[in-house]
């Protein structure tokens, strides 16, 4: 079996998540996002970082991510023909809440040519909150106002005939009107709402989000207390978060929009008391507390050129 170095090419030791993925995907043709030296005879000494789990990483993010890439697509990766767009964002203090749902509940929300993605014969719905910061157009143009906001989204998990894994958004709430209008014009169903991050105090510092839609159309309040000593390394947690694109319908056509970033620094977390009407408003019924609660300090992202999904 080919061996991948546990040190990144910038000299730093690989993170526990990267090491776990290296263990799970040690074969050379399924190289994970650990920039190392491949000992495969055909590629001996070639420094690589593949899209097997984390999707293609554009060269212009290489210095930020501390890694290089051969931009191949893999089992959970994005489109091998990934073409980066000059749009970058940072996603910070990400709280992931997930519930297991029947596959039949997700089917009606899939665009043509897209089907629910499954993990152990089940699919999931997610309620995710995070802060968007440092939005840039091109290498130098920052958007300090329009590009800084709070987002809360409800999403399902999808896969198309080309094997691209992604998400289908049922709703996205954000507190920056300019961004909402631009995103809706691109076919992404953003809603302008009152959104804000909250900090919870207890035995540890927690992170949460509050959303209130205008005209009383729904609200949500949720959060999590992360355990920063326990990285989330299980297969389900990686499957839920290693999503590097979204499927969306624009008019009569369906597109896959790739999004590239380095591996999530992902941690187990405990849910705080929460009240949510957004998942129900999106048409999905869940019962009880979430089945999975995760937290990430965040990642730097770059959007790619949309690809049409052929049904």
Predicted regions and their residues:
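Extended, compositionally biased
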Residues: 124-174
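Extreme N-terminal basic, low-complexity initiation segments
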Residues: 1-18
């Amino acid at each position: 079996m080919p061996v991948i170095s546990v040190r990144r090419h910038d000299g730093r030791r690989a993170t526990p998540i990267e090491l776990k993925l290296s263990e799970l995907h040690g074969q050379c043709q399924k190289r994970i996002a650990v920039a190392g030296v491949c000992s495969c005879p055909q590629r001996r000494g070639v420094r690589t970082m593949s899209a097997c789990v984390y999707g293609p990483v554009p060269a212009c993010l290489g210095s930020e991510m501390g890694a290089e890439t051969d931009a191949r697509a893999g089992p959970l990766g994005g489109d091998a023909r990934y073409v980066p767009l000059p749009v970058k964002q940072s996603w910070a203090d990400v709280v992931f809440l997930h519930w297991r749902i029947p596959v039949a509940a997700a089917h009606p929300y899939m665009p043509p040519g897209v089907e629910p993605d499954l993990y152990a014969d089940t699919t999931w719905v997610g309620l995710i909150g995070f802060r968007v910061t440092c939005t840039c157009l091109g290498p130098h143009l920052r958007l300090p106002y329009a590009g800084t906001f709070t987002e809360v989204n409800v999403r399902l998990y999808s896969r198309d005939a080309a094997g691209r894994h992604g998400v289908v958004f049922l709703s996205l709430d954000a507190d920056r009107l300019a961004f909402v209008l631009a995103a809706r014009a691109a076919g992404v169903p953003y809603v302008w709402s009152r959104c804000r991050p909250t900090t919870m105090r207890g035995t540890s510092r927690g992170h949460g989000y509050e959303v209130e839609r205008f005209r009383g159309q729904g609200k949500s309040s949720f959060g999590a207390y992360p355990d920063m000593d326990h990285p989330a390394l299980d297969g389900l947690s990686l499957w839920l978060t290693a999503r590097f694109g979204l499927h969306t319908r624009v008019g009569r056509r369906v597109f896959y929009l790739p999004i590239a970033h380095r591996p999530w620094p992902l941690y187990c977390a405990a849910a705080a008391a929460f009240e949510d009407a957004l998942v129900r408003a999106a048409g999905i019924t869940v019962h009880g507390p979430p089945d999975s609660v995760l937290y990430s300090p965040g990642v730097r992202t770059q959007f790619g050129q949309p690809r049409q999904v052929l049904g």
